[in-house]
């Protein structure tokens, strides 16, 4: 199985990198795990709606270039479906049972994801209505993917 987190922007914070590296190491017995960063589009502080859509479109194109045709894609979106850890684990288990060996998770930049990326996604997932920095979301998502594997093997980690 291959798990890929595709995200906009570079992760600079050492403490986030260390946390993600720890979960990547733990996941290595279950899946190949990788983070793919695409450049964020430089933009001024205040943007018109048209400029915002243009930024999302450019970032979206960069994201789509990293997704293969057969990949199963989760888009992280505030309006996506919330799942419990158990539901998420069951979903991952079901995907692998039905032959989806490449699963991508897409985290947008500060303006969110383009309509094209949302359209390409097989499903949208939400971690709640909170707004979180996308750097932190990488760590939270890494932990939840690891937790899903642990639930699926019956590990006490989830308790």
From Swiss-Prot:
Residues holding S-adenosyl-L-methionine: 76, 108
A cellular component annotation (GO) from this entry: cytoplasm
Catalytic EC class: transferase
Presence of keyword Nucleotide-binding: no
Domain of life: Bacteria
EC number: 2.1.1.177
GO terms assigned for molecular function: rRNA (pseudouridine-N3-)-methyltransferase activity
Keywords (A to Z) from UniProt: Cytoplasm, Methyltransferase, rRNA processing, S-adenosyl-L-methionine, Transferase
Reactions accelerated catalytically: pseudouridine(1915) in 23S rRNA + S-adenosyl-L-methionine = N(3)-methylpseudouridine(1915) in 23S rRNA + S-adenosyl-L-homocysteine + H(+)
Signal peptide: none
Entry-linked InterPro entries: Alpha/beta_knot_MTases, RlmH-like, tRNA_m1G_MTases_N
Pfam families on file: SPOUT_MTase
Intracellular or extracellular location(s): Cytoplasm
Membership in a protein family: Belongs to the RNA methyltransferase RlmH family.
Quaternary data: Homodimer.
NCBIfam families (alphabetical): PRK00103.1-3, tRNA_RlmH_YbeA
HAMAP family to which the protein is assigned, alphabetical: 23SrRNA_methyltr_H
Function description: Specifically methylates the pseudouridine at position 1915 (m3Psi1915) in 23S rRNA.
Protein name: Ribosomal RNA large subunit methyltransferase H
């Amino acid at each position: 199985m291959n798990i890929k987190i595709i995200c906009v922007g570079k992760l600079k914070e050492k403490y986030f990198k260390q946390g993600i590296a720890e979960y990547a190491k733990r996941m290595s017995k279950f899946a190949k795990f990788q983070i793919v960063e695409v450049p964020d589009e430089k933009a001024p502080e205040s943007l018109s709606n048209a400029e915002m859509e243009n930024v999302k479109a450019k970032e979206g194109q960069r994201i789509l270039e990293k997704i293969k045709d057969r990949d199963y894609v989760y888009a992280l979106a505030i309006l996506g479906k919330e799942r419990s850890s158990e539901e998420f684990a069951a979903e991952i288990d079901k995907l692998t049972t039905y032959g989806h060996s490449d699963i991508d998770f897409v985290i947008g930049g500060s303006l969110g994801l383009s309509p094209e990326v949302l359209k390409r996604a097989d499903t949208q997932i939400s971690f709640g209505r909170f707004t979180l920095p996308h750097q932190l979301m990488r760590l939270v998502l890494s932990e939840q993917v690891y937790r899903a594997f642990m639930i699926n093997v019956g590990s006490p980690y989830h308790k």
